[in-house]
């Protein structure tokens, strides 16, 4: 149905090997690595060490967004983890390590281990989906993490509590050799510059999809639709926020226009179904 191969500057991507009809389930995966709501970033490396070697390699093969500031932050997190482990185990390990021998493994992580720790933190932060369920807060999936972003995606992911899996379905027909895409953003009505800002900060790239190409008629028309929709939503929210009487007709009119914008852009799925 699909294959994972080069997507140019984006790295690897998921492509249709044949026509994928709308509604087809493309992926159904259990988490490779996940955090519970009561866990934090300091638990990521510990959890990764519990993975089977094959799964650990799958995790380390995923790409990540790294900047100088993020690298500095994650090295600090890795060093803090090491120090915390040291002081936690200090009373038990002191007799064994009071005579330092350079050739013997110690309680400190080696430099390579610290590098791996930093890499895993970066990979998790770049690839994790925020599920925010009772059992799982964030999770990384081996195949789904290869799906790249598009502001007008052709697929959508949803977590199934019953199955314990993250499912990705086609929201429209996906042609042979077309790349499968998801939206990494929550605000579907955001303007191009706002979308770029969030994508640059969170993932390190500026989207080059059709909706972001303001040099094309499609891109310009889409941007105008989004501007008009945001203005309409803002006016409605302001009238209600200022104590204005809630008008069912006005609310319905606003929602119908919002749905019209989504449909004109080709955005389907939960965004329309939840209106």
Feature annotation, model-predicted:
Residues 1-275:
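Conserved catalytic SET/PR domain of SAM-dependent protein methyltransferases, capturing the structural core
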């Amino acid at each position: 149905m699909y294959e994972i191969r080069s997507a140019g500057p984006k790295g690897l991507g998921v492509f249709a090997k044949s026509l994928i009809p709308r509604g087809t389930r493309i992926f159904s995966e259990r988490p490779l690595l996940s955090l519970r709501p009561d866990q934090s970033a300091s638990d990521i490396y510990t959890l990764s060490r519990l993975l089977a070697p094959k799964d650990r390699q799958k995790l380390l093969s995923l790409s990540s967004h790294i900047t100088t500031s993020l690298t500095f932050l994650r090295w600090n997190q890795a060093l803090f983890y090491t120090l915390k482990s040291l002081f936690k185990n200090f009373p038990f390990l002191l007799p064994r390590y009071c005579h330092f021998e350079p050739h013997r493994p110690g309680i400190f992580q080696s430099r390579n281990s610290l590098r791996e720790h930093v890499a895993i933190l970066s990979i998790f932060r770049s690839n994790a989906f925020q599920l925010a369920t009772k059992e799982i807060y964030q999770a990384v999936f081996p195949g789904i993490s290869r799906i790249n972003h598009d502001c007008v995606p052709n697929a959508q992911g949803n977590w199934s509590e019953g199955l314990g899996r993250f499912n990705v379905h086609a929201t429209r027909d996906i042609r042979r050799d077309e790349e499968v895409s998801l939206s990494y953003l929550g605000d579907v009505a955001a303007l191009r510059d706002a979308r770029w800002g969030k994508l640059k900060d969170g993932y390190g790239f500026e989207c080059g999809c059709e909706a972001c190409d303001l040099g094309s008629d499609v891109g310009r028309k889409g941007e105008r639709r989004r501007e008009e929709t945001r203005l309409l939503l803002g006016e409605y929210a302001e009238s209600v926020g200022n104590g204005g009487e809630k008008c069912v007709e006005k609310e319905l009119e606003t929602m119908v226009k919002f749905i019209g914008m989504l449909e004109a852009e080709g955005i389907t799925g939960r965004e329309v179904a939840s209106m």
